[in-house]
């Protein structure tokens, strides 16, 4: 794509890619980072999200430095953490994990944190952390079992996908919706634009939804 700097998304998440496309930004490459996302003992949710976003950016930068076509690109990484109080919920991959998450979230408030980390062409690191407060309705056991049967929760922070069936569980949300999906668009585009990335470059060719 001529006319703008190269842009790399350090993620394999279809949701983050879709959100970027929604904002008219199309990555030149995806560089998912193989990072251990296990929280450290006693680690707070904010600190965990920030640490993992930076680790993903570091890993992607090392990969990009070895690629002549991408060297000097903007690199964006992100990590989303769902927490009840100080308790970090897992990215559920097992049925028991998902059920435990949903029972914990049922009828309660929780917070979703997404940390974004941008590496500039000069290899400077810029980070932002965005918080959204979410309240779920009280979930019956039938709700939980039916949702688990959908499979929508697999690999999702907190064991749910707000852009899917679980959107019907939300009683109240305070803050960025796209943050809960996995990438806060306002903060992301503001950060990119502030570092000189032409965020409007793709708008003329954007497809209306």
From Swiss-Prot:
Annotated site (Important for substrate specificity)? 15, 80, 163
Q: Does the keyword Hydrolase apply?
A: yes
Name the catalytic site residues: 79 (proton acceptor)
Cellular localization per UniProt? Cytoplasm
Instruction: State any GO BP term from the record.
Output: nucleotide metabolic process
**What is the role of this chain?**
Nucleoside triphosphate pyrophosphatase that hydrolyzes dTTP and UTP. May have a dual role in cell division arrest and in preventing the incorporation of modified nucleotides into cellular nucleic acids.
Name used for this protein in its record: dTTP/UTP pyrophosphatase
């Amino acid at each position: 794509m001529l006319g703008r700097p190269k842009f790399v998304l350090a993620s394999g998440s279809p949701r983050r890619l879709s959100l970027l496309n929604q904002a008219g930004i199309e990555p030149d490459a995806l560089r998912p980072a193989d990072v251990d996302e296990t929280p450290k003992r006693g680690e707070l949710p904010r600190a965990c999200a920030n640490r993992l976003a930076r680790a993903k950016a570091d890993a992607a930068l090392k990969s990009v430095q070895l690629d002549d076509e991408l060297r000097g690109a903007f690199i964006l990484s992100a990590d989303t953490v769902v927490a009840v109080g100080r308790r970090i919920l897992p990215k559920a991959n097992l049925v028991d994990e998902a059920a435990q998450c949903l029972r914990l979230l049922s009828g309660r408030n929780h917070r979703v944190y997404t940390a974004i980390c941008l590496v500039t062409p000069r290899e400077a690191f810029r980070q932002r952390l965005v918080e959204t407060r979410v309240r779920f309705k009280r979930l019956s056991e039938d709700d939980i079992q039916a949702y688990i049967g959908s499979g929508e929760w697999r690999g999702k922070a907190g064991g749910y996908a707000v852009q899917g069936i679980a959107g019907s569980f939300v009683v109240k949300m305070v803050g960025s919706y796209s943050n809960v999906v996995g990438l806060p668009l306002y903060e992301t585009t503001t950060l990119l634009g502030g570092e000189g990335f032409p965020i409007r470059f793709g708008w003329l060719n954007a497809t209306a939804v």
